[in-house]
Regions:
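A residue-level marker of the well-folded mature domains of exported/periplasmic proteins
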Residues: 1-180
Length: 180
């Protein structure tokens, strides 16, 4: 499988996101996962007129109402834990990084599904194969118990910005490990 990336350089431009999704459909993409906030890509997937369906993975809101026959799953970032822990730090005159229940790298903080910072919003059981929900729940449990790294596996690639920048996830990638 090949992953193609299109950058919109915005979180919330319906027309730009639709255009990027349409380009992916025209390039014979079979699954579009978005990391922007409008329903544009889901609408493009739902309305794509071709023999092979174009499925969709949503971000920050359920897309099932927009793409009932194409939206597989949606997830969201849940900042509530970060905000609660940050406010606690401020009220107790502590550094935020000392109070975060997650990984911190200098001034960057992050956590995933294991800490509740990322959540699955819905799985469209009307279109996914039987047993998908249970498989997702099992995968989440493995992540929560530290038995599965999200950014790891037999995947390699090349950066779209620098062809000399090779990506190899046979060794797990720690996001933002070298930031700040």
């Amino acid at each position: 499988a090949v992953m193609t990336v299109k950058y919109t350089n915005t979180w919330s431009s319906y027309s730009t996101e639709k255009q990027a999704a349409k380009e992916l459909v025209d390039e014979d993409c079979v699954v579009i996962s978005q990391h922007s906030d409008t329903v544009g890509p889901a609408a493009i997937c739902e309305n794509a007129q071709r023999d092979i369906p174009v499925y969709h993975v949503g971000y920050n809101q359920s897309m099932t109402d927009i793409a009932p026959t194409r939206s597989l799953v949606s997830c969201c970032v849940d900042y509530s834990s970060y905000f609660e822990q940050s406010v606690y730090a401020l009220l107790h005159d502590k550094k935020i990084e000392e109070c975060i229940d997650g990984r911190t790298y200098k001034q960057d903080a992050m956590a995933g599904i294991d800490k509740g910072w990322v959540r699955i919003l819905d799985i469209n059981e009307a279109i996914v194969p039987k047993g998908t929900k249970e498989m997702v729940e099992d995968t989440i449990e493995k992540i929560e118990k530290g038995k599965l790294e999200v950014f790891s596996g037999p995947f390699t690639g090349v950066s779209v910005f620098d062809r000399n920048d090779k990506i190899n996830l046979n060794t797990p990638y720690k996001e933002n490990a070298n930031s700040s």
